[in-house]
Amino acid sequence: GGNLQVTLTDTVGFIQDLPTELVSSFKSTLEESKHVDLLVHVIDASNPYHEEHEKTVLSIMKDLDMEDIPCLTLYNKADLVEDFTPTQTPYALISAKSEDSRENLQALFLEKLKDIFEVFTLRVPFSKSYKIHDLESVAILEERDYQDDGEVITGYISEKNKWRLEEFYD
């Protein structure tokens, strides 16, 4: 993980039975997320209408042409529901009040991003090693192998940030 920078955006809560202006606010906030690498959809599993909520959000995502964005569904409060069955994949059952659950989220996000991002191997001469810090903010650097003439870095990077690797090539 290192210094990978992420941006989290929160939308208004559930949108069914909301005043029209809040529904449009939800849609516009969600629409701003069209270019994200990973959309995290948090569901209150203890809400008896959670399946309808999921369907509504998925329908809006389809309307906004966002159904191809990789999505991770987090079911919060699933521990409060007997025999809870998730309806979306990939998913994780979480409890926002549990410290273990919060710590596991970072690892879960990194694993999901590794699934989405492309693997790269990069030879960086010592003369360009000062640029590695900038790379750490947009890529997951998995391995750094120091050699006589520089280092070899293996990691993961998004399609839209692949151009950042070009500055290391001669």
Model-predicted segments: where are they?
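Conserved ATPase-coupling elements of RecA-like P-loop NTPase cores
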Residues: 17-20, 49-54, 82-86
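Walker B catalytic acidic pair
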Residues: 11, 45, 77
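Inter-motif core of Ras-like GTPase G domains
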Residues: 22-47, 63
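Alpha-helical scaffolding segments of alpha/beta enzyme cores, especially the outer helices
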Residues: 31, 56-59
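Switch II (G3) loop of P-loop NTPases
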Residues: 2-26
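Hydrophobic "anchor" residues on beta-strands that sit immediately upstream
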Residues: 6, 33, 40, 72-75
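C-terminal-of-GTPase-core extension/linker across diverse P-loop GTPases
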Residues: 48, 59-170
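Short loop/turn elements that form and flank the Walker-type P-loop nucleotide-binding site
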Residues: 1-5, 34-36, 66-69, 87
